[in-house]
Design a protein with these regions (language model features):
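Phosphate/dinucleotide-binding and metal-coordinating scaffold of catalytic cores
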Residues: 1-159
């Protein structure tokens, strides 16, 4: 799943209340060093559309301004991998000699889809493809935790 390209955008998919399938809510795009969000027209036209987080991303068309001091909407940053998930991704990238590409969009698009919350990030606006992780044993999980903790590269099976 790791790519050598730098991502320029990510589509934000959301599970709306009472729905079992996600819908594309909008797009997060690079704007210099910032990532800005724009709701999709089809999302805004939905009768059941809800703001992803009203203080930062109210339901309205156009690129939404960033809160002062932030380089991207905080609610979307909260939906991306935490420090441990980023550390695992860094080790995965280090194994592939492209750790320098671990920016925010890479973290969003290369982490697993089975996250807490009702958001996921995809490369497509038309097809939702979950990024699933194969189940591992408790022993394998402990082994990978020890490896990352001690700065050792993960095996391809555990990455």
């Amino acid at each position: 799943m790791t790519s050598r390209q730098r991502y320029k955008e990510a589509y934000v998919w959301a599970w709306l209340p009472g729905e079992v399938e996600p819908v594309v809510a909008g797009i997060l795009t690079k704007d210099g060093k910032n990532l800005v969000f724009n709701y999709g027209r089809s999302y805004l036209e939905r009768k059941n559309a809800i703001p992803l987080y009203t203080p930062e991303l109210p339901l309205r068309a156009g690129v939404l301004p960033l809160p002062e001091g932030l380089h991207m909407p905080g609610c979307l940053r909260d939906a991306s991998p935490d420090a441990w998930g980023r550390r695992v991704l860094m080790y995965k990238h280090a194994m592939l000699a492209n750790a320098d590409e671990l920016d925010e969009l890479t973290c969003m698009l290369e982490s697993a889809s089975n996250r807490i919350g009702a958001l996921d990030f995809q490369q497509s606006a038309t097809q939702y493809i979950p990024r699933l992780i194969e189940p591992v044993t408790l022993e394998q999980l402990q082994e990978s935790t020890d490896m990352v903790t001690h700065g050792l590269p993960l095996s391809p099976e555990l990455a």
